[in-house]
Amino acid sequence: MLRLSDATYLVRDHDEAITFFVDALGFALREDETNASGRRRVVVGPADGGTGLVLALTDAADAVGNQAAGSVAFFLETDDFAAQHARMTAAGVRFSEEPRHEVYGTVAVFEDLYGMPWDLIQPPALG
């Protein structure tokens, strides 16, 4: 069995990224360790499991917020779109569009702390 455990997410600052992911998106801080050489490893992800994001510092400032060249790179799936949308909006997350209904579910695009677009999506009920 294979599963994607983590993906790299480029950041300018670990602490500002932790604040966004934990406070605004409701993620858990899964790991925050500094090794003997001084390199810090930070991993955040949904509290109930799934793929984590390794928050990686980079000197390539133009890459931060542009990891997918302006396209949506990450998709947050929820089973209660209205509640998550309201919670995220109250936490200061900026949605760039109103929620819309598509054949693949209810979706709205939001921007992360660096302006990169993400989807919040609730798939249609199966049945």
Name every feature range the model reports, one short phrase each:
Residues 11-14, 36:
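Conserved beta-strand-loop-alpha-helix junction that forms the acyl-donor binding cleft
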Residues 17-22, 88, 115:
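Conserved active-site tyrosine of GNAT-family acetyltransferases
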Residues 9-12, 79:
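Residues in soluble alpha-helical coiled-coils and helical-bundle/repeat scaffolds
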Residues 1-6, 28-77, 83-113, 120-127:
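Vicinal oxygen chelate
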